Amino acid sequence: MKCVECGAEVDSLYTYYGRGTSNIRLAQCKNCKQFADKYIELDVVLISMDVILMKPQVYRHLLFNSLSARTFRNVVNFCILISLFNVFLVWSRLEKRAALFPYFTPAQAFLSQPIIRQYLTLLLICLVETTVYQISVVLLLCLTMGWKSWTSASGAVILSSSTRMLPVFMVIWDYDLSIAATVVEWVVLFSNVDALCILTGSRRYFKIGLIVLFASLVRSIVVYIFLHLTGLSQIQPSTPCDGFQHFVNLLCVYFRSITLTAQTAV
């Protein structure tokens, strides 16, 4: 157990006085004199908001004071939920793109397949991209930093990837842009780096950043192969442009290729 404010080791997080969650007293950290874990008394909604805001305190609470063999199942369920949201986002964007470009064959060809096949294909791509990224990060942490606990590393990546659910609100309010998915993916990568640095207790942001970046490149290669096999690799039609706009488009393509996922592909 660790203090969420300073990261120092603590003997206990609270003192239990009787039945009910209100009959507890939060322990004080001897190092920083703050409450060791203020999130014990907060509900899931407030904790989720701090996770989206990438606060280091909530990462320490989840990774050091809450994560166990039992709670890791909930983390895996959360990962599956994110994948299901990804399927919804990709599917909705494909339908919008097919409506905007009725003569653009890749989207039309994919959407002409049976609905079950469409869903299973997108679900497979989303699950594979998540699994490949998770395995790559864990293996690289083990090989380069000697990290032993794969559950904590995987949990850190999953919990810090909750920002990926934000584009759902953009779809609901009809502000969905293709560049937004790429921006969100880069925010997720920075969040992963932050969470892994907190987990390992290391300030080597550059080294962990390279680990996350390399894992993202491996994921991009696998996703491109799957998109090529399903005929979705050329789903975004190119638009002619010149000058500064051409440079911006090339820059966007470069950043998108590093974080290629099913979301950024469409």
From Swiss-Prot:
A GO BP term here is: intracellular sterol transport
Q: Its function? A: Mediator of sterol homeostasis involved in sterol uptake, trafficking and distribution into membranes. Also regulates the sphingolipid metabolism.
Q: InterPro entries of this UniProt entry?
A: Arv1
TM segments?
A: 71-91, 122-142, 153-173, 179-199, 208-228
Q: Which Pfam family, just one, is annotated for this protein?
A: Arv1
Q: Which domain of life is it from?
A: Eukaryota
For this record, the Gene Ontology CC terms, alphabetical, are: cortical endoplasmic reticulum; endoplasmic reticulum membrane; Golgi apparatus; Golgi membrane
Report if keyword Lipid metabolism is assigned.
yes
Question: Which keywords does the record carry?
Answer: Endoplasmic reticulum, Golgi apparatus, Lipid metabolism, Lipid transport, Membrane, Sphingolipid metabolism, Transmembrane, Transmembrane helix, Transport
Q: Where does the record say this protein resides?
A: Endoplasmic reticulum membrane; Golgi apparatus membrane
Which ranges of the sequence are coiled-coil? Answer: none
Family affiliation: Belongs to the ARV1 family.
Indicate how the chain sits in the lipid bilayer. Answer: Multi-pass membrane protein
Protein's name according to its UniProt entry: Protein arv1
